[in-house]
Amino acid sequence: MKHESSLNRIVIALGGNALGNTPKEQEEKVNVAAESLVNLIAQGNEIILAHGNGPQVGMINLAFDLASKQNNKVAEFDLPECTAMSQGYIGYHLQKGIKKELKRQEMPWHVATIVTQILVDKDDPAFKNPQKPIGGYYDEATAREFMERDPHIVFGEDAGRGWRRMVPSPRPVDIVEKDSIINMLDNAFIVIAWGGGGIPVIQDEKGDYQGIPAVIDKDLAAAKLAEIVEADYLFILTAVDRVSINWGMPNQQDLA
């Protein structure tokens, strides 16, 4: 079904690595990207921004884990809360950069971030095989030290680049906040949603949503988002030069 807007509706997925490794670097990259994003609006499009958070959420989670072990006044935060934090601060930088560019171009559009929950199947086989890398890169000795400190944490080697924390990556089923996203799109908002693939949730026996420690693949999430909002286009932006299969392996093949 086609959405009712006369404008082209575009979902843009920004890779977490494309946003930099520190808040300062991230803000600088967002400010550079903001002009191109706002230009899409000026050309007769409406946009929804999704973004990765692999480096960011991993660093947030690890920081709280280490701090809580050093100081009992620091609470531990599980992955759903850390994902929400990353959605907040990445969304803040995106909002600020885009709002500044909207003002410069004298455009009356609004911009807002929605903390987004994503429904997943509690029986998804991914929960038995955590393979989604998040956070920074470590040598093997450091990674094994982290696992010795906390047996619930799993680290694995990531395509020859180092060791990273591995978490389950279930497939997205639905967006809890989809009505809010569509309503804002229909009212001249640039919407920032589904940050980091969204906060994975399952429904309990009462029908309430419960967060779970997992990360949804950002590209799968963006595709589901594009489907739900009936987007005309889906753009996936990343820090790598081209699309490849068997990436980082001897039989790597570049597709584009």
Where are these regions (language model features)?
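A glycine- and small-aliphatic-rich helix-loop capping segment at beta-alpha/alpha-beta transitions
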Residues: Q26-N31, A63-V74, K128-G136, K206-P213
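Ligand-binding beta-strand-loop-alpha-helix segment within the catalytic cores
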Residues: A67-V191
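Short beta-strand segments at enzyme active-site cores
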Residues: V11-A13, E46-M59, H110-V115, V191-W194, ...
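Short acidic, glycine/serine/threonine-rich loops at helix termini
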Residues: T22-K24, G58-A63, D123-N129, Q203-E205, ...
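Alpha-helix C-terminal capping segments
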Residues: N39-Q43, H93-K103, K224-D232
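N-terminal glycine-/serine-/threonine-rich phosphate-binding loop
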Residues: M1-A50, M59-K69, D78, N183-D186
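Solvent-exposed alpha-helices and their adjacent loops that cap or buttress functional pockets
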Residues: K2-S6, V11, R104-M107, V173, ...
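Conserved mixed alpha/beta catalytic, RNA-binding, or beta-rich assembly cores of soluble enzyme
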Residues: A18-G20, I175, I190-N246
